Swiss-Prot record:
Name of protein: Glutamyl-tRNA(Gln) amidotransferase subunit A
GO molecular function term, any single one: ATP binding
NCBIfam families: gatA (TIGR00132)
Biological function: Allows the formation of correctly charged Gln-tRNA(Gln) through the transamidation of misacylated Glu-tRNA(Gln) in organisms which lack glutaminyl-tRNA synthetase. The reaction takes place in the presence of glutamine and ATP through an activated gamma-phospho-Glu-tRNA(Gln).
Family, as annotated: Belongs to the amidase family. GatA subfamily.
InterPro entries: Amidase, Amidase_dom, AS_sf, GatA
One protein family per Pfam: Amidase
GO cellular component: glutamyl-tRNA(Gln) amidotransferase complex
SUPFAM superfamilies, per the entry: Amidase signature (AS) enzymes (SSF75304)
Keyword flag Aminoacyl-tRNA synthetase: no
Higher taxonomy: Bacteria, Bacillati, Bacillota, Clostridia, Eubacteriales
Superkingdom of the organism of origin: Bacteria
PANTHER family registered for this protein in UniProt: GLUTAMYL-TRNA(GLN) AMIDOTRANSFERASE SUBUNIT A (PTHR11895:SF151), TRANSAMIDASE (PTHR11895)
């Protein structure tokens, strides 16, 4: 029995019924990872010993008749910018290469409380800055559907690991599309929750007003289970919301009667790949067949999201990354005498080119004379975009768009085309700017490469997104198809 081919919810049921042991499940994923990750590059660190030790402890509890909760020993992979006590937390950067986290992020504490087993730390774009996972300081991540193509980013390791069956569930981080975009390109489900739904405590910051922990799974049910486990208020995160967390599994039903889905014309422009357009149109027909009402709508300000995003995110990044200086912690150049020289050289050698580029851009937009001209204006645009979404979401329950206007491109294809690379998140950034929940659902293939559609919902209505996504899955098998490795 190939346990790595099972979904997380199938594994939970099998462990509950004592059909398999937790240790067997963990060993299956370790063996799978050791067999294929040399091709994929999804893992930066595999925590074999601690995972097997925890699996044995859980098996002993089950044998004693104790009822577990939550994940029942199902393994989870963690993006390497989320703190796990005793494990590396490099952000895929040379400057944090030897940094070991002394504490658990809130999401990790909640995983452990709900019997999730941490299997390792997953590769990413350095400090979550990138859309292709070509910016990792250690190694690139390859798309399981075509090893010569990118998996998307910045959570490319998290999505590629799930797609290649190296892990059933994973956590990524979202700033402008870093879970949804690679989820679409790798053919898995990826959720960005409402800003404030999931605690950011223990996540190394990129842009504090945009960052969120996202969940990734093989299907909507897996994603819903993981999201429920880690959601909820956290007093250690000042942006955490005091909003009750529903039982997301109860929202999973095929019937969409009464659900209104908006179709914004601004997301279906001429530059959208025709084969992707066809897949989205087919998905819409299925949702209609399942009872949903499709309504044409307009989000005229969405086109300004990308510009506002790259001003706001780089400004916040330049401030957040100032603390990584080689003096308090991080890689340190010890051959220099002056603190200023140590600071400059440590950061110059420790940060990659993309990170340095964004720090400089962010410093510029916050400088005298530019703050009002760029940063304040971007904040005003952000407010207008939020109001635009609020207007539409009074008339519909969710909005459907493509997740990405292209499928996975080849390595090096866009590295020298900055605008082309930055536009990779064109369809995901609007929801991030507005702080809304959004999910990517696999909906087909274009020339053998996965395609996904995006659902955007109202604040704290992840349940509706799960409902629509689940309904679609009940009429299709795209989420079940596995890449041949």
């Amino acid at each position: 029995m190939e346990l790595f081919n099972k979904t997380a919810h199938e594994l939970i049921d099998m462990i509950k019924s004592k059909e398999v042991k937790v240790e067997e499940v963990v060993k299956s994923y370790i063996a799978r990872t050791e067999c294929i990750d040399e091709k994929i590059g999804a893992y930066l660190y595999l925590s074999k010993e601690s995972a097997l030790k925890e699996a044995k402890l859980l098996d002993e509890k089950i044998q004693r008749g104790e009822k577990l909760k939550g994940l029942w020993g199902v393994p989870v992979g963690i993006k390497d910018n989320i703190s796990v006590s005793g494990m590396q937390n490099t952000c895929a950067s040379k400057i944090l290469e030897n940094y070991i986290s002394p504490y658990d992020a809130t999401v990790i504490s909640r995983l452990k409380e709900n019997n999730g087993i941490i299997l390792g730390k997953l590769n990413m774009d350095e400090f979550a800055m990138g859309s292709s996972n070509e910016n990792s300081a250690f190694k690139i991540v390859r798309n399981p559907w075509d090893l010569e193509r990118i998996p998307g980013g910045s959570s490319g390791g998290s999505t590629a690991a799930v797609a290649s069956r190296e892990i059933p569930l994973s956590l990524g981080s979202e700033t402008g599309g870093s879970v949804r975009q690679p989820a679409a390109l790798c053919g898995v489900v990826g959720l960005k929750p409402t800003y404030g739904r999931i605690s950011r405590y223990g996540v190394i910051s990129f842009a504090s007003t945009l960052d969120q922990v996202g969940t990734i799974g093989r299907d909507v049910t897996d994603c819903a289970i993981l999201t429920e486990v880690i959601s909820g208020f956290d007093k250690r995160d000042s942006t955490s919301a005091r909003v009750a967390v529903p039982n997301y599994k109860e929202s999973l039903k095929k019937d969409l009667t009464g659900i209104r889905i908006g179709l914004p014309k601004e997301f279906f422009k001429e530059d959208l790949d025709e084969s992707i357009r066809k897949q989205i149109e087919d998905a819409i027909k299925i949702l209609e067949k399942n009872g949903a009402e499709i309504k044409i709508c307009s989000l005229p300000l969405a086109e300004y999201s990308l510009s506002a995003y790259y001003i706001i995110s780089t400004a916040e990044a330049s401030s957040n990354l100032a603390r990584i200086d080689g003096i308090r912690y991080g890689r340190r150049i010890n051959t220099l005498d002056k603190h200023e020289d140590i600071y400059i050289q440590s950061r110059n050698e420790g940060f990659g080119e993309e990170v340095k580029k964004r720090i400089m851009l962010g410093t510029y937009v916050l400088s005298k004379g530019c703050y009002e001209k760029y940063y304040e204006k971007a904040l005003k645009v952000r407010t207008l975009i939020k109001e635009d979404f609020k207007r539409v979401l009074k008339e519909v329950d969710a909005i459907i768009t493509p997740t990405s206007k292209v499928t996975a491109f080849k390595f090096g294809e866009r590295t020298k085309e900055v605008l082309s690379m930055y536009s990779s998140d064109e369809y995901t950034v609007p929801a991030s700017i507005a702080g809304l929940p959004a999910i990517s659902i696999p909906c087909g293939f274009s020339k053998g490469l996965p395609v996904g559609f995006q659902l955007i919902g109202d604040y704290f209505r992840e349940d509706i997104l799960f409902n629509i996504g689940y309904s679609y899955e009940q009429s299709t098998d795209f989420h079940k198809i596995m890449a041949k490795l």
